[in-house]
Amino acid sequence: MPFIDENQLSVREMREEEAPVVLEMLKDGFKDTENRLILYILTRPMTLLLMAVASSGLRFILNSFSVALVIPVLLTIVGLKLLLWRSPDLKQIYSYYSIGQRKIWVAVYDQDDICGCVALEPTQDHQTVELKRMSVSRWYRRSGVGTHLLKFFEDHAKKKGFRGIVLYTSVVAKAAIGLFKNCGYKVTGGWNWLGYTIVQEFRKDI
């Protein structure tokens, strides 16, 4: 955990030319969470059972135990990766968050070092905003950048008249979950996979 001078840390709107840097930072964070989430899903009893059934059927078709064992695992991994990366905002991140009240900000240290980001998207009820794309550069994690971004986000949402914040995070993102709980966010739902929660929904009134 690096020591940082909070007086040198600021948050501002992302510039168009900074989009590639932010996208790489998001991808780096995704890889960590994505791999842990896939491992979590693959080791659930129901997933193991389904893959075992699929492997048994493929053995008779392919006449190869090793190939029949590998194919269901590979198909599951590919399917999960496609599902996790199905996000329209990542294709054109700058233009997407330049429409209406959507916003994306970067945390900048020492004037030019981009060390984090967070995005805002209003929900359909116009009372709540969704916190999205919150990420901290690997070198700056656990140094207070995430807390700084979260406070900035909440302050902005309040000034714009929103009454609540909703966000979604993977169950394997322990550091993020800890941060949100410490800042007053409550679990209000989630997404399930074969009966297991893989994404938690958090909400907070502001």
Swiss-Prot record:
It comes from Xenopus tropicalis (Western clawed frog). This is Probable N-acetyltransferase 14. GO terms for molecular function: N-acetyltransferase activity. Belongs to the camello family. Its main location: membrane. It is a multi-pass membrane protein. Keywords: Acyltransferase, Membrane, Transferase, Transmembrane, Transmembrane helix. The chain crosses the membrane at residues 37-57, 60-80. The keyword Transferase applies. Probable acetyltransferase. It is found in: Membrane. Its EC number is 2.3.1.-. InterPro entries: Acyl_CoA_acyltransferase, GNAT_dom, NAT_camello-type. It is an enzyme of class 2 (transferase). Gene3D superfamilies: 3.40.630.30. One of its GO terms (cellular component) is membrane. Residues 9-206 form the N-acetyltransferase domain.
